[in-house]
Amino acid sequence: MDREYLLKLCEDIRADRISCEDAADILKELPFKDMEFARIDNHRSLRTGYPEVVFCQGKTDSQIADIMELLWQKNSTVMGTRATEANYSAVRERLPEAEYFEQARIIAVSRKEADKKGSIAVITAGTSDIPVAEEAAVTAEILGNNVSRIYDVGVAGIHRLFDSLDEIRKANAVIVCAGMEGALASVTGGLVDIPVIAVPTSIGYGASFNGLAALLSMLNSCANGISVVNIDNGFGAAYTASMINRGKYE
């Protein structure tokens, strides 16, 4: 239940479009709805500004569809991460308006286009990092941010990064997705005066240990202003960057 939904409910009660009894039935599901296999947090948007997001991995198609359908009843935007085509097909049967972002593996449905303010830059070291970057970029857009995508600017050809610095510096936060040794986050952090959210990716050869090498490199960065999220966690990076960007306009 987001603030817009709650205000509309109050207005409907005041205008006698809904009875007090019906309103009580709606409000009794606050702060959460028990679905037995999940307890849906109806207060998430009121507390944090964003509704609950469905992590689809490990859930059945039916569970995902049930959860997203329930969230849709009380929120203007609903999204699910780490979703498959099969997950999307199940959701679309309930919510025909739903979209699927294949590379980002995100399902999203919205009643209206977000009023986007400010911008977030999303950059990658290589093309192989793009799926993680797209999870970040699409999430940031759904959450109401303009996004600049700057891909394949890793340290093996550092001049490519320098060529895009003006665009990166216009953003209020930058998300850096890099695998292998993860050096791009440190380099970027030493060149900009905005927060850097580093995302280690699982891309690389054997000794990269599926992103562990990049994670440790980013955690040990000597550049200031860098925060690090979990391996391949584009969603977490976008959520943090969105809070930073949103704070500029509230």
Residue ranges and their predicted role:
Residues M1-T84, Y88, R94, A98:
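Long amphipathic alpha-helical segments
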Residues V53-V54, V78, S119-A125, V174-V176, ...:
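Short glycine-rich or small-residue beta-strand-to-loop segments that form or flank ligand, phosphate
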Residues K117-H159:
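Glycine-rich phosphate/diphosphate-binding loop of Rossmann-like nucleotide-binding domains
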Residues T124, S128, D166-R169, A173, ...:
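C-terminal binding/interaction regions
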Residues A104-A108, N146-E167, L212-A213, V229:
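Glycine-rich oxoanion-binding loops at beta->alpha junctions
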Residues S62-I64, D129-E134, I158-H159, A178-V187, ...:
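Short glycine/serine/threonine-rich phosphate/pyrophosphate-binding segments
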Residues D163-T201:
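Glycine-rich phosphate-binding loop
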